[in-house]
UniProtKB/Swiss-Prot annotation:
Pathway: Cell wall biogenesis; peptidoglycan biosynthesis
Family annotation (Pfam families): Asp_Glu_race
Purpose of the protein: Provides the (R)-glutamate required for cell wall biosynthesis.
Cell wall biogenesis/degradation among keywords: yes
Keyword Cell wall biogenesis/degradation: yes
Name of this protein: Glutamate racemase
Protein EC: 5.1.1.3
GO molecular function: glutamate racemase activity
Transmembrane segments: none
Reaction it catalyzes: L-glutamate = D-glutamate
Active-site residues per Swiss-Prot or TrEMBL entry: C78, C189
Gene3D superfamilies, alphabetized: 3.40.50.1860
Amino acid sequence: MNKNSPELHPIGVFDSGVGGLTVVRALMERLPFENILYFGDTARVPYGVKSVETINAYARQITEFLLRQEVKLLIIACNTMAAVARQSVESLSPVPVLDVIDAGARRAVAETRTHSVGVIGTPTTINSNAYARAICRLAPETRIFSQACALLVPLVEEGWLDHPVTRLTAQEYLRPVLAEHIDTLVLGCTHYPLLKALLQDVAGPDIHLVDSAEAMADATAELLQVQHLTNPERIPPEYRFYVTDVPLRFQQIGERFLGRSLPGVERVQL
């Protein structure tokens, strides 16, 4: 096959930091022969405190960089960018664009039986109402109960994945959501899959957790098949990682998110 065939081109995944590596991990497991290129804007994280105009400008810069790498698909693995900048990305991109919010919302609608869905995420994501809007577009009858969980991201990055402090914090955050008798809980932050076992334990066995990273991987597999973009080669894929800064403990945190060693990371300037 011609090396310029679109099927052989990489999937481009981007985030403001390291959280999107949970999406890369899910893609590696779901699509083991796909080449993947990851971009983390680690010099300018967090995006949540930035203006809408700034986030859109950053998203356009990243999109242009990834398109120069000849990606066949763009995945917005950052909830903040997905909530604010998807239209900016789509307006620039000649290739398909997917995002974690849409994937998580679709999975939640498919899974809920009582039309009562909880959503947890960072304050920025929750305040944007992006998940609620996406779910309501798909199923207007759904009752949605959202909860901002400001402390979970730093606890994950500290590595306290099953720490008593993390468990107590999760219990406090989930209490009002669980009181609404939801049957489905969306993990609306790419850090949260690392807390999946703890959150399931706190929520109880009757609550279905929607892992937006897994949902994103499934949506990607479906799109590649429909658009005939699946890589037909059965050889070890190439993974490339780009960042705008290599902050303290980046390697350690990145490997925790990816679930394997993080190969050579290249620092770039936009």
